[in-house]
């Protein structure tokens, strides 16, 4: 479904509100300079995976995005003692990676191939973590339809609901008509969700969380979700 072209000024305003929402949860937010050469670079989550022990720079499946990795590497390399990199022929975007404690689920998608996933798992193993793959059928990225909160609680939608891989979790089921809200962010006992999804909001509140709504309608038009807009560590 085509949602129309994004309104640039509205997107800027929404981005500022997103930053304020993260700050209201107690996070220190580092805002990067705009990178006009790479229009997708606002979706900063995809180009690096940050773990407690290392930073892993990815190799996006969208060739037009590969230059973004160098930009983020320049910013982050000095902040981590251990930095790793995914190499060709592997491709991976971190929107396909969901961390649950010390285990990482990796979606195999149009953007993430098995070579990229295997490289990530090898790196994770080196630092004492584990990883496994999930085949995607419909969504762009794994976290388009899944968000892990804490305490075994998983926000889940669509193709993942009946997947036995996720049967061990306590599900917060998001109805198909509000599937965009399945991409949300848990931050210090708060859950950030996109504005305008009352059923999803109610379900998450009923689980005991404080919900903060953030309008990201202009980023939805670009297939971007809440988690895509930040690297959290």
Language-model features: locations:
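The feature marks the mature, well-folded catalytic cores of soluble enzymes
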Residues: 1-233
């Amino acid at each position: 479904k085509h949602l129309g072209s994004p309104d640039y000024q509205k997107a800027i305003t929404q981005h500022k509100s997103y930053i304020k929402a993260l700050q209201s949860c107690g996070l220190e937010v580092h805002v990067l300079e705009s990178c006009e050469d790479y229009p997708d670079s606002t979706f900063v989550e995809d180009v690096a995976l940050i773990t407690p022990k290392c930073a892993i720079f990815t190799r996006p499946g969208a060739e037009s995005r590969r230059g973004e990795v160098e930009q983020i590497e320049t910013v982050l390399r000095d902040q981590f003692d251990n930095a790793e990199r995914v190499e060709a022929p592997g491709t991976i975007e971190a929107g396909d990676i969901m961390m649950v404690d010390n285990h990482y689920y990796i979606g195999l998608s149009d953007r993430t191939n098995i070579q990229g996933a295997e490289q990530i798992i090898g790196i994770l193993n080196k630092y004492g973590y584990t990883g496994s793959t999930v085949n995607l059928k419909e969504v762009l990225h794994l976290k388009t339809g899944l968000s892990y909160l804490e305490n075994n609680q998983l926000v889940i939608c669509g193709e993942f609901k009946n997947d036995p891989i996720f049967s061990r979790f306590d599900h917060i089921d998001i109805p198909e008509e509000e599937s965009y809200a399945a991409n949300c962010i848990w931050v210090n006992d708060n859950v950030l969700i996109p504005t305008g999804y009352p059923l999803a909001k109610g379900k998450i509140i009923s689980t005991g969380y404080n919900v903060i709504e953030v309008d990201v309608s202009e980023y939805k038009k670009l297939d971007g979700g809440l988690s895509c807009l930040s690297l959290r560590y």
